[in-house]
Amino acid sequence: MLLKDPILAFKQFYRQFDQQSLNALDGIYSEDVTFSDPVHIIQGSDKLKQYFESMCGNLTSCRFDFIDEVIGENDACFKWEMHYSHRSLKSNAPLRLMGTTFIKYSEKIDAHEDFYDMGAMLYEHLPLIGSAVRLVKSRIKKSS
């Protein structure tokens, strides 16, 4: 499935991010897409699909709300809020994460780069590490 507008296809894909939505990945990302986030750099749509399948396996829900965007002729930037629940984090309670995505595209997305706070996504929600991360953040806030 190739949608005419890669921006529309991208946003539609992430509005409800789950195992079923992954079927649309080939219509959105080019075969040789480069994907990066704070943890990974992935080359190729097959490897990206494997990464997303692994991620979705641990999520009980995930959706993105797009808050703002800047669209260029062949690139775009999105500010988003992710709403997710993860089996191993906070007893599967609903969580939120703010982030930004930068994409480059032609007919499909050729490059996708995510920016977000890994501590807010994961570390703050782990039993021992979480309290240490929150303590450090609060001390930094007080000193600035």
Predicted feature residues:
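Short, low-complexity N-terminal intrinsically disordered segments enriched in polar/charged residues
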Residues: 1-23, 27, 140-144
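Exposed alpha-helical structural elements
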Residues: 9, 24, 47, 121, ...
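A beta-strand edge to alpha-helix "cap/lid" segment located at domain peripheries
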Residues: 58-63, 70-144
